[in-house]
Amino acid sequence: MEARAVAKYVRVSPRKARQVIDLIRGKEIGEALGILKHTPKKASSIIEKVLNSAIANAENNHDMMVEDLYVSKAYVDEGPTMKRYRARAMGQAGLIRKRTSHITIVVSEKKEG
């Protein structure tokens, strides 16, 4: 049995979010939360909220034991990019890409034995 949580259209670059999500993939819940709490990145607080949501979904919707959970899947997909312009010299304009992410975390119970 597995429970998942998804955060869509998060205003953080997918590349930067993947750096953080790679740290917790395959880890137990307690260890993953500890890693996220001590990672000095903007994406770590967002990913921590998604992980807590996945834990709550597992506990409340699927009657899973929190002590037996681990992060079975964790991935970041690219969302839509907001395009903004910055005025440059001699009448030109520079393009600024504000990237967004879709963050998905799936937690599962460890198999006994």
From Swiss-Prot:
SUPFAM superfamilies: Ribosomal protein L22. It holds the Pfam family Ribosomal_L22. GO terms for cellular component: cytosolic large ribosomal subunit. CDD domains: Ribosomal_L22. Keywords: Ribonucleoprotein, Ribosomal protein, RNA-binding, rRNA-binding. This protein binds specifically to 23S rRNA; its binding is stimulated by other ribosomal proteins, e.g. L4, L17, and L20. It is important during the early stages of 50S assembly. It makes multiple contacts with different domains of the 23S rRNA in the assembled 50S subunit and ribosome. Part of the 50S ribosomal subunit. GO terms for molecular function: rRNA binding; structural constituent of ribosome. The keyword Methyltransferase does not apply. GO terms for biological process: translation. InterPro entries: Ribosomal_uL22, Ribosomal_uL22_bac/chlpt-type, Ribosomal_uL22_bac/org-type, Ribosomal_uL22_CS, Ribosomal_uL22_sf. This is Large ribosomal subunit protein uL22. Belongs to the universal ribosomal protein uL22 family.
